[in-house]
């Protein structure tokens, strides 16, 4: 069968977006892995699926699958692309959209020239909300790594879980070495996304993220939210912060006790069609 799709990216975090309202397809783990292959498939960080919602307050249901086929709760760069996709495909004429995710409701607002502002919901900090193994909640935690190395982290759930550590320079940070250790650490029973943040000043940070089940990506929207919120909680950052990632910049806004707002661009790369039989086992 032929499957129509769209390739998009948010700051280099790239997606295959599939409308399963107007067409039908069964995409199992093995099929997703084959589609994600950058040599023999479409190639992407995540597959984004558009489905009818299960709850009356939502316009759409948004499902996210990593390149290894695992389903995850949230993707900040993805939800911006999702919002642009459903609008450009005329699945809705709304510019303010309510989207059901595995982590709850998010509300993207379409702006001009592909920019989207998203209500990302409330950040969560308690160990059982991450989840993270800890005796009691603390502002910062010490994580023991290999070779008697320790790092100080904050933990934030932005629809998916993040550990944030502050580094002197993101360019020289050992993301490839430390990232996998944090991601699969025994204190994170569902694994974790590891963020490495450099504070430039109170309105500007640089960030690299080693994503759970993916590895380091050019950008991570929920990671940018988690890092900014972590810095604000520590008293290092103002309530509106520019987060600079390898793929570009996001603006993150947060007030204590309120929702987090993320604003950033989207890019429509191309529309495609493929014979799904070649990717199924």
UniProtKB/Swiss-Prot annotation:
UniProt keyword terms in alphabetical order: Amino-acid biosynthesis, Cytoplasm, Isomerase, Lysine biosynthesis
Site (Could be important to modulate the pK values of the two catalytic cysteine residues): residue numbering on this chain: 162, 211
GO molecular function: diaminopimelate epimerase activity
Catalytic activity annotation: (2S,6S)-2,6-diaminopimelate = meso-2,6-diaminopimelate
Primary residence: cytoplasm
Binding site for substrate: 13, 46, 66, 76-77, 160, 193, 211-212, 221-222
Described function: Catalyzes the stereoinversion of LL-2,6-diaminopimelate (L,L-DAP) to meso-diaminopimelate (meso-DAP), a precursor of L-lysine and an essential component of the bacterial peptidoglycan.
Name of the protein described by the UniProt record: Diaminopimelate epimerase
Source organism of this protein record: Acinetobacter baumannii (strain SDF)
Gene that specifies this protein: dapF
